[in-house]
A protein has these predicted regions:
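Mature catalytic domains of secreted/periplasmic carbohydrate-active enzymes
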Residues: 2-461
Length: 461
C-alpha cells in the first residue's frame, strides 16, 4: 500500500492573503515617502490598514475548500502583522495570533509568508542599501572591493527589470494601467553602512518567534536567488537544525536543488505560463507549487478579464501534480476585493466536488505537452493525463475562450485499443464513442463541456 501523503506533498488549492496591495502604490515604491506616510509625529507606525478581518478570511478559505493557506506576516515594507518584541514597526493588533487560532479551528494547514530578502523597516535605515525602491539587498553575496556600489547597482537594475516584466505582463494580458502610482518616484542613491549581520540577527529572532509562539504548519520565504544572496542558505541551515518539522519553501526555488526544503515553488501569473510550467514540472519527483495573483497583478486589484483564467490555471497545475496558490488582495478595511474573491470562490465550489480526482491522482509519465495518442480538434483545448486508482484520467482544458460547439476527441487505437468505457467526471456519466480501424472518436456534447476542466475517466479492458 502506498504511504499516505501529507498535505504539502499532494496537489492542492491554496490562498495567500496579501497585505502589501495598497491603492496609490506599486510593488516598487519609494520608501522614503511610503514610510513617512505611515508615521505619526514621533516617527511611530501610524497603521492604516489593511485592517485584517482574520475570522472572515479564514472562513472564506473554509467555504471555498482550500487545502492550505498563507498569510503575509511581513512583506518587503517590513511592517510586522504579529506581536514581535524586536521592532515597533508592527500592527496594533496581533493578526497572526487570530489567523493561527482560526486556522486550527477550521483545520486548515497554515503557513506564514515572510520576506527574508528585503525589509524597509525604518529601524534599518542606516544599513538600507536603497530607500527609494523595493529591491534593496542586505545580504547580497559578493566580496568585490566595491561591494556597496555593487549592492546598490544590482538592486537598482533588479528594480528596472521587475518594472519591465510588470509592464509586459500588463500589455500582453490587456488589463488597464493604474495611473495613480509610478514605478519609480524620485529615485536616488543614499549612503549606507554595509552591515548584513544586524538584519540577519533580527530575522532569525523573528523566525524563532513565529515558530515557537504561533506554531505554523509552514514558512513560505520570499525568496531564493541561487548563490547570489546569502539569507536563503542560512535559513535552510537554521530551520533544518532547529525546526525540521515545520514545512519550508522558498519562492523562485523550483528549478533548484535546495539542500533543505520540503517543497519548491515559483510564480505563474497567467494561464499560458501555468500551462508551460505545469508541463515542465509535471514529471518532478518532489512536491512543487506555483503561485500567482488572484487579481490582474500583485499591485493591480481588478479581477482578471477572463473569469475562468484562475480556475483553469489551478486545474492545469493540480492535474500536473502541483499545488496552485493565489494571492488574494484586501482593501484597507480588510474586505477582500470582490472581483478576485468571486472568481476564486466560483472555482472553489467547482473544486470541492472534484478534489479527490486531483489529490489522489498521479501524473502520467510522458514527454511533451500532450497525452500520447490523443488529439483534440479544438486548438485552444489542451489535454493532461493522470492515473487515478487503476484508471487513466484525461483533463481537457480550454486555455482561451469558452465552449461554442461539441468537442471532438480522437484516440489512436495503437495507444488506446483496450479502451472499453469513457465516463464524464464527477457525474460518472457514460459517453458514447465510435471506433474504426485506426481511431476511437468521442464527441462530447457542448452542454457537457466544462468551462474549467472536462475530466474523462477511461475504463480499460
Amino acid at each position: 500500500m502506498a504511504e499516505k501523503k501529507l498535505w504539502w506533498q499532494k496537489p492542492g488549492f491554496g490562498i495567500q492573503y496579501q497585505i502589501e496591495a495598497r491603492p496609490g502604490w506599486r510593488w516598487n515604491r519609494n520608501y522614503e515617502k511610503f514610510n513617512a506616510s505611515m508615521m505619526d509625529e514621533n516617527r511611530n507606525l501610524k497603521f492604516n490598514g489593511p485592517l485584517c478581518k482574520m475570522k472572515d478570511w479564514v472562513e472564506f478559505s473554509r467555504q471555498i475548500g482550500v487545502d492550505y493557506h498563507i498569510f503575509e506576516v511581513k512583506w518587503h515594507d517590513g511592517i510586522c502583522y504579529f506581536n514581535t518584541k524586536y521592532t515597533n514597526w508592527k500592527t496594533p493588533e496581533d493578526y497572526v495570533q487570530i489567523y493561527a487560532e482560526e486556522s486550527r479551528k477550521a483545520r486548515i494547514p497554515f503557513m506564514f509568508y515572510y520576506s527574508s530578502i528585503f525589509d524597509h523597516n525604518p529601524q534599518f535605515d542606516a544599513i538600507q542599501p536603497l530607500k527609494t525602491c523595493t529591491p534593496s539587498y542586505f545580504t547580497l553575496r559578493t566580496t568585490f572591493i566595491l561591494r556597496k556600489t555593487l549592492i546598490q547597482g544590482f538592486s537598482f537594475v533588479f528594480a528596472i527589470g521587475a518594472g519591465i516584466l510588470f509592464k509586459l505582463n500588463r500589455i500582453f494580458r490587456r488589463y488597464p494601467k493604474d495611473k495613480s502610482a509610478k514605478w519609480f518616484d524620485h529615485f536616488r542613491f543614499t549612503p549606507f553602512k554595509d552591515d548584513p549581520k544586524t538584519y540577519e540577527i533580527y530575522m532569525f529572532n523573528q523566525l524563532t518567534e513565529l515558530v515557537t509562539k504561533y506554531k505554523p504548519d509552514g514558512l513560505w520565504m520570499d525568496w531564493y536567488m541561487l548563490s547570489l544572496e546569502d539569507s536563503a542558505y542560512k535559513i535552510m541551515d537554521f530551520m533544518e537544525k532547529k525546526y525540521p518539522d515545520v514545512v519550508l519553501t522558498f519562492n523562485d526555488s523550483i528549478d533548484s536543488k535546495l539542500r533543505w526544503a520540503h517543497y519548491t515553488t515559483a510564480e505563474a501569473h497567467d494561464v499560458k505560463a501555468a500551462w508551460n510550467k505545469g508541463n515542465r514540472y509535471r514529471r518532478n519527483k518532489s512536491p512543487w507549487e506555483l503561485i500567482g495573483p488572484a487579481a490582474n497583478a500583485w499591485d493591480n486589484f481588478l479581477p482578471r478579464p477572463d473569469p475562468h483564467e484562475a480556475a483553469r490555471m489551478a486545474a492545469i497545475l493540480m492535474a500536473s501534480g502541483g499545488k496552485a496558490c493565489f494571492g488574494m488582495p484586501a482593501q484597507m478595511d480588510g474586505t477582500l476585493y470582490a472581483g478576485p474573491a468571486g472568481q476564486l470562490a466560483q472555482f472553489g465550489q467547482w473544486y470541492k466536488k472534484r478534489k479527490a480526482l486531483f489529490q489522489d491522482a498521479t501524473p502520467m509519465d510522458y514527454k511533451g505537452q500532450k497525452v500520447p495518442g490523443i488529439a483534440v480538434k479544438e486548438k485552444h483545448v489542451k489535454n493532461i493525463g493522470c492515473i487515478h486508482g487503476n484508471d487513466p484520467l484525461i483533463h481537457l482544458i480550454y486555455l482561451f475562450g469558452v465552449p461554442r460547439q461539441d468537442l471532438i476527441v480522437k484516440f489512436c487505437r495503437k495507444n488506446w485499443d483496450a479502451l472499453e468505457k469513457i465516463l464524464l467526471e464527477p457525474e460518472q456519466q457514460e459517453l458514447d464513442f465510435t471506433k474504426d480501424a485506426l481511431e476511437i472518436t468521442l464527441t462530447i456534447p457542448k452542454q457537457d463541456v466544462d468551462q474549467t476542466d472536462t475530466i474523462l475517466r477511461l475504463k480499460m479492458k
